[in-house]
């Protein structure tokens, strides 16, 4: 059974006003007072963000429970530092991001200017174990067209600087400003993958292989494929669903590779259009079907994803969990829909944020 780990980035906000607060250093200090050897929480690009990482899990119920536990611990440490945590992929309220300055981030600030300054976005990264780089590259090649569906399911960033962006996942559009971000062409072999990464680093435009921000990549730290397209999800059960589907995609792709089935050869241009459509429409409109690359009702494309990974989900014991979670998500709506409904009901972005703080805990 493949292990799965999740990394989530959370927004630190004022519990009264909902405005982001640059208190990550204070929050981490509280976490380290409790456990000097803690390795769960760490700083991110901006001081208004906090990241946590789960341990690798094979059981999805255990992974979901750990996500909830980490969020609650983050909330406790944040409360002691004078702020709250919100699983929001962008700040609904206007904010001037505060870059957490170390040598790496200083280099990035000088290199990328306003694109770096405005990159106050919170994502969810899923690591799924692979047996080798050869299997990993085969997986990366085969999951490419399905990743926009994860964008739509996780979409949780409708607001930007106090305005409705008209997108369901505006975070993914902001993230796309990085020069190395986005979908990839077919690699075909680990040699070609590693050669491309080395060539990208050699340009000097990016600092190292950690800044190769492919939608899915071989992790440079773990024996995993890292899927990097999702917004941080408002509700923990949605994060668990994204991880479940990610493992299903990886396992299905590995099986296709071993069976000699070739990957879809969609161009990067088409994949970018699919990603844009998913960010714009989320679950409320139409998506591009991963095989035909033609518009289809979002629910139908989500059902196609479930069918595509169905055997892998069943073999892992995750089929019922995935179907139930998808049904609930389609009924309730993704985070973007929830945020917009909160604003419509309360008339206040501040109240929207404070309610999202509550819902972050599950």
From Swiss-Prot:
First-tier enzyme category under EC: ligase
Entry keywords, A to Z: ATP-binding, Ligase, Nucleotide-binding
Alphabetical GO biological process terms: modified amino acid biosynthetic process
One Pfam family in the UniProt entry: GCS2
UniProt GO MF annotations: ATP binding; glutamate-cysteine ligase activity
Catalytic reaction list: L-cysteine + L-glutamate + ATP = gamma-L-glutamyl-L-cysteine + ADP + phosphate + H(+)
InterPro entries referenced in this protein's UniProt entry, alphabetically: GCL_type2/YbdK_subfam, GCS2, Gln_synth/guanido_kin_cat_dom, YbdK
Disulfide-bond pairs as recorded: none
Enzyme Commission number: 6.3.2.2
Span of the signal peptide: none
Record's function text: ATP-dependent carboxylate-amine ligase which exhibits weak glutamate--cysteine ligase activity.
NCBIfam families: gshA_cyan_rel (TIGR02050), PRK13517.1-1 (NF010041)
Sequence similarity: Belongs to the glutamate--cysteine ligase type 2 family. YbdK subfamily.
Protein's recorded name: Putative glutamate--cysteine ligase 2-1
Biological source species: Streptomyces avermitilis (strain ATCC 31267 / DSM 46492 / JCM 5070 / NBRC 14893 / NCIMB 12804 / NRRL 8165 / MA-4680)
